[in-house]
Amino acid sequence: MGTARFLSAVLLLSVLLMVTFPALLSAEYHDGRVDICSLPYDSGDCLRFFEMWYFDGTTCTKFVYGGYGGNDNRFPTEKACMKRCAKA
């Protein structure tokens, strides 16, 4: 039973790394911090339905958020997205 748990943990960690690592590589960094507006679109997990906004590099675009996971390039309103991400 211990081996099965270990293999499950290794599999879970592998999946998390495969999902997270490419997103971090594609992000821009400023002063050592991730610029959340440069993170890729990510609808998250689960099957809930929340209308949210993300910055696509040019403008804010509406999308459906699943309710769990995803990344910080997610805003409750277009105004909040533009305020945080649009360059003046």
Curated annotation (Swiss-Prot):
GO terms for molecular function: potassium channel regulator activity; serine-type endopeptidase inhibitor activity; toxin activity. InterPro entries: Kunitz_BPTI (IPR002223), Kunitz_BPTI_sf (IPR036880), Serpin_venom_toxin (IPR051388). Expressed by the venom gland. Residues 37-85 form the BPTI/Kunitz inhibitor domain. Keywords: Disulfide bond, Protease inhibitor, Secreted, Serine protease inhibitor, Signal. CDD domains: Kunitz_huwentoxin. The record marks 47-48 as: Reactive bond for chymotrypsin. Transmembrane segments: none annotated. Residues 28-33 form a propeptide. Residues 1-27 form the signal peptide. It comes from the Eukaryota. GO terms for cellular component: extracellular region. It is found in: Secreted. Disulfide bonds join 37-85, 60-81. Serine protease inhibitor that inhibits trypsin at a molar ratio of 1:1. This is Kunitz-type U15-theraphotoxin-Hs1b.
